[in-house]
Amino acid sequence: MELRIPRRLLVLSVAIWIAASGFLWASHPSARITVRFYSAGLELPALYGSELDLPSAITKGVILDVYEHLENCRFQPFVQALANHQQELQLSDWHLYEVAARASEVMFQDSRYQIIFQWFILRKLGLDTQLFFNGPEVFLHAPAEDVKFGFYTLDLYGEQYINLTAKRNNLNMEDTKAYIPELLRDGKKVRSISMEMKKLPLLPDGRIVERLLEFTHLGQTHRLKVRLNDDYLKMMDDYPYFNQAQFFHLGLSPEAEASLVPALEEMLAGRNQLEKVEFLLSFVRTAFLYKDDRRRFGHEKPMSPEQTLYHSYSDCEDRSSLFFYLTQKLLHIPAIVLDFEEHVGVALELEGVKGNSFNFEGRKYIYCEPTGPSDELAIGEMWDYVRQQNARILTSYLPGE
C-alpha cells in the first residue's frame, strides 16, 4: 500500500512541539558550518533553528510530521552543497552519508532528530533510505545490493535493507526488534545506495606517513622509502567491506604513487620484461610478513595497495592487489586476477613463457604467484595446493582500457 505525504500546514502535534519549545525560525541564509571529513573541512549551509523537540516514542506520525516540517525549511542550499562536495571530491555514497551524518551532529542535539534529518536529506539527494523504529529509537536503513557482510540487515518486500545507523555507530543490534512501517513513497526518484568506491576521494593536504620497505631479489637487499597518505589509510580502515574486485582498481594516493613508482622504475631499468616481472614478484613476496586475515582480524578484510604498503603483515589477496597495480603502472601488459577457493593470485600475458596458464577472452595468461612464504616459485609455477583448486576471473586489465 502506498503511503502519501499530505500537502498541508504543520499538523497539530508539530504546532504543540513548536509552542512548547519556544521555537523561532532561525535558518539564516548566511549561517555556515564546517564538517570535518578526515583532514578536509567541508563547508555547508547551516539549518540552525530547524530542530523540533521529539516525543519520547517515535511513531509513523512523528516521522511524517518531521518530514513535512523539513519540507518547509530552506533545505535546498544544504542539499546542493552536499551534492557539489560529492562531485568535486569523488565521494562514494557511503562517504556522502558520513558527511550528512556529521553535519546533522553539528546542527542538532537529539540523535533521533539527526537520523530523521539524514533520512530526509539523503532522499533529497536521490538515495533510497527508510526509517525503522522500535519506540524510543529510530534507525536509518537502505537497500544495497553490493553489501556482502558487516551490516545488520532486514529482508523486506524482496529487498535487503542494511542498517546504516548501527554500522556507523558500532551498535549491537542482535536482540533489537524494529517496527517497520509502510515504506515512504514521496514521489522522489531514488536509487539504492552503492558501497562501490571507484576512486579514492580527492582530499587535499592529507598528513603524510613514511614507510621504509626492505626486500630481497636474487640474494641482494633493496630498500626504498614510500610516502603514504594517512587520510586514505584511515579511510580504508573505516570503510565497509564492498565488492572484492573493486579493491584491485583503487590504486594509490598521488603521494604514494609519486614515491613508489619512480623508485621501482629506477630499479627496473636495464632489465627485460621477464626480469622485471621477477623483480616485482620478489618485492611483493619479501617486503612484508604474511598473516591471514582471519588470524589478524577474525574475518576477511581486503586491503588497498596503500594499506598493504603501510602494514607489516598482509595476505595473498593484499599482495595480489599490489602486484596487479604495479604491473599496470610499470609493465603495461594485460593481467587477470584469479580468485581460487582458498587463494588469490595474478596471471600476466607473457609471450613465449611456459608454465601454468589460464585462457581468458582469447588471451593466454601465465600464472605469477605474488605470495610467499618464500621467493622460490618461478614465473608459471604454482603451489600444489593452489593448482588443485578451482578459480574464477575476479577482474582484469587491458592497456588502454
Role assignments for model-derived ranges:
Residues E2-V11:
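Bacterial N-terminal signal peptides that target proteins for export
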Residues V11-S21:
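Bacterial N-terminal signal peptides
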Residues L24-E401:
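A structural boundary/capping signal
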